[in-house]
Design a protein with these regions (language model features):
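Alpha-helical tetratricopeptide repeat
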Residues: 1-148
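Feature recognizes metal-dependent phosphohydrolase scaffolds
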Residues: 106, 123-416
């Protein structure tokens, strides 16, 4: 339908629906507003503001892919429509596509130089984009060792005045190597580890907003990183015959919500398994506590506490939405190193779980046909197989396309 084909009656109906949608939006009823804006668009698809208004609702409900699509539609109708560029920039920024978001914010500042909000958004996006580009350039110029290989726990004793929960200690046998890499005799060492008493202790310690000694943080991260790297990218899950499995969505640093889940639903145990489906950090003020508790539970119940990686378990999102700042604030002396170590652990997280060969759990969503291994083969059906996910390379940051990207970022969008 073109603008000329829209009757006065249809236009009047569309405007009435828009007013209803605006009222719903003002009442924070975003899903209901989306429905009304959709009806308005169906009545009169020629008005770009209908699309950008719906895009704003999608942004509030974290439907960033749909928001970008609506912004694209608005700009197809009117390439000069400033709100189209702004909404698309916000959606792209939320999806971590900084280069594209930066270009759209710049376009808004050119077309509306007096828009202070747009100038501020562009400055923030530009600063973050340049910072990440600089860090990536440094990383590509040197053979950077993994942070996990550089941490020497002997340098981080538990402070004498520390009065919180303490890790248990066990004897382990390890092989030592010379500088030339030759194996030496096996040696017995003390190793701290996570037991139920420690998990119970840090649960209350964090509830009272106290921090762990950096030594214990390093121990948890080093041990969980070693554990996670042994797992496939797609983990098969069996529910205990005498127990249950609870699947939970985004917790985003809301530590007290996590405690409430365990209070109402039961704490993780050998018979009560949990699967948390990504986005553990950012936005909330206690992302570090959530992550340390989850990693501690993973060490305590390696076959009963499961963690999927989400799109917020990545560098760009953590720099944009708060986790990096939180880590640096709570551990100022070790903040940069600790944040990098968290990123290594995030990269080791599996991206999907298959429950009882029946239920597929992934943070992002299903996959585009172009992502399938056989997509370019003659007769290929464009369907991603589970074995492709099991063999997926995941020990890196998500790119703009591919299996890892879509496992974390595949927002539902309308198909033409």
């Amino acid at each position: 339908m073109t603008a000329a084909a829209v009757t006065d009656a249809a236009s009047s109906k569309a405007n009435a629906l828009k007013l209803e949608a605006n009222a719903l939006y003002s009442s924070h009823k975003y899903h209901e507003a989306i429905e009304k804006y959709t009806l308005a668009i169906e009545a009169d698809p020629s008005v770009p503001a209908f699309y950008t208004n719906r895009a704003q609702c999608h942004i509030h409900t974290e439907g960033y892919g749909a928001a970008k699509q609506d912004a694209d539609s608005a700009l197809e109708i009117d390439p000069t429509f400033i709100k189209g560029y702004f909404r698309r920039a916000v959606a792209l920024l939320a999806m971590g596509q900084l280069k594209e978001a930066r270009a759209d914010f710049r376009e808004v500042t050119k077309r509306a130089p007096g828009d202070a909000v747009a100038r501020k958004k562009f400055a923030e996006c530009d600063k973050l984009y340049r910072r990440i580009q600089f860090e990536q350039a440094i990383d590509s110029e040197v053979d950077r060792k993994r942070v996990a290989d550089t941490v020497d726990l002997k340098n981080y004793p538990v402070p004498e005045d520390y009065s919180g929960p303490r890790m248990a200690v066990r004897k382990v046998v390890r092989k030592r190597e010379t500088q030339e890499g030759e194996e030496q005799e096996e040696v017995e060492e003390d190793e701290e580890y996570v037991d139920q008493a420690f998990v119970d202790g840090i649960t209350e310690w964090f509830r009272n907003q106290k921090t762990l000694p950096i030594r214990y943080v390093y121990v948890i991260l080093l041990q969980v990183d070693r554990l996670l790297r042994q797992l496939p990218s797609l983990v098969d899950v069996s529910v205990p015959a005498d127990g249950v499995l609870t699947v939970c969505g985004d917790v985003h640093g809301q530590y007290y919500d996590v405690l409430n889940i365990f209070k109402l639903n039961g704490a993780p145990s050998s018979t009560h398994h949990y699967l948390f489906n990504g986005d553990f950090v950012d936005r909330g003020s206690f992302s570090l506590e959530v992550m340390l508790l989850f990693f501690a539970y993973k060490l305590l119940h390696p076959q009963g506490f499961y963690l999927n990686r989400g799109n917020h378990e990545s560098v760009g999102m953590n720099q944009l939405y708060g986790f990096e700042g939180e880590v640096r604030h709570k551990y100022p002396a070790q903040g940069k190193r600790l944040f990098d170590l968290f990123q290594e652990s995030f990269e080791a997280l599996p991206v999907a779980h298959l429950i009882q060969d029946k239920i597929f759990v992934v943070h992002g969503g299903l996959y585009s046909r172009e992502t399938a291994k056989n997509a370019t083969q003659e007769g290929g059906d464009g369907v991603v197989r589970l074995d492709e996910l099991r063999a997926m390379s995941r020990f890196h940051q998500p790119q703009h396309s591919g299996l890892l990207r879509e496992s974390l970022w595949s927002d539902p969008q309308h198909q033409n």
